[in-house]
Amino acid sequence: MKEFKCELHIVGGALTGLLTAYCASQLNYKIIISEKKKIISNQKKAISDKRTTAIAEGSKVFLESQGLWQYIKEFAEPIHNIKVIDKTAKSKLFFSNPKENSNLGYIVKNSKLIEVLIRLLKKKKNISIIEGAGISSINSNNSKILSFSKNEKISSDMIIAADGKNSAVRKILGTNVFKKHYREKALVINFYHEKPHKNIAYEFFFKTGPLAILPMQKNKNNFQSALIWSNNPQSVDMIASTELQKKYVTEILNEKIQQYLGRITNINSIQTFPLSAHINEKFYHDRAVYIGDAAHSIHPIAGQGWNLGLRDIKSLMNMLKRSKNTKTQIGSIKFCKAYNDLCFYDAYRLFEITDKLDWIFKNDQHYLKFVKKLGFNIIEKNKTLKNQIVNFAMGI
């Protein structure tokens, strides 16, 4: 069995794990990334992810502070405005950044983010990557935490669990988790359309569920957007599995969005994902902390899932930086509890907000239609309230 030693053992080599490793490497920690799949060496697999990530303005500021935005910005399509249209209550809202010449956020392909991070991580001398290493057991004592896979033993000061919704670390350590299954699936489509999107993001609320359209970069001379549509599993499966898939999807979507973007000219990709949310009872264990989807996931209705995970990373980096400067012990119970206190309630609040928003906008009861219409009118006319919502969406 091979033995490895490091200060930080990051379990999970997807987007959150890679970003955490890069940021921690800037603080000169010795790091090991372990990943059960061969995502990093097999870049073809990494770039096959057709999904997009919405990066809020506040998240962009953090990425700038880490020296990362300079590599990402060429792939990022800005969001200038957001239009919210509730089809059940026939109400509309229009949001823009109150600061002149500023954006609300950016849309970037996951594959581009991963590509950039892998390229930068390969240049780091204080990062080692172990692939094909699924964690099978974990033991800890007062000063170290040991993790074991089939062929490796890794000794570290702290484990950072970034291994997603179905975290193996969480399961092994026995951290309790609350799960919410929405009995919905998300239909994720990248498509080309006739008219320019003018950097406007749309959020439609239908009785069946929300539909978001996000502006993407032009591909050559083709206008392109990403669509995320939450619907019941039967409808999503029927749309995604039909033999005349692209033609059928095009017909359905043209009915809903043609007046905004013109006709759909081509469907680039179609993917489906079951919708669920979860939150851990706590975001730490003995010498281990959970970040991103290993700690929490939320309904995509507000497009804030990845930004919430990035706030975990930001909080953890501030603590690691402080520990480096004061020479305090990382991974101690005091350290891990302090991280939990910084991140848990922020995540719990957003978990509850997105869950309630989903319920409100899916509910077709008459009194709720009235409440939604009234709420939309109040927000549209109240500049202060509108700006507060914009700041929340931007993560500032």
List the predicted regions and their residue ranges.
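Beta1/beta-strand and adjacent pyrophosphate-binding region of the FAD-binding site
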Residues: M1-T16, I32
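N-terminal glycine-rich dinucleotide-binding loop that anchors FAD/FMN and/or NAD(P) in oxidoreductases
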Residues: I47-E74
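Central beta-strand plus flanking loop segment that forms part of the substrate or channel wall
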Residues: G58, N166-A201, N231-S235
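Conserved FAD/dinucleotide-binding core of flavoprotein oxidoreductases
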Residues: K207-F273
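C-terminal helical "tail/cap" subdomain of flavin- and related membrane-associated enzymes
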Residues: N318-I396
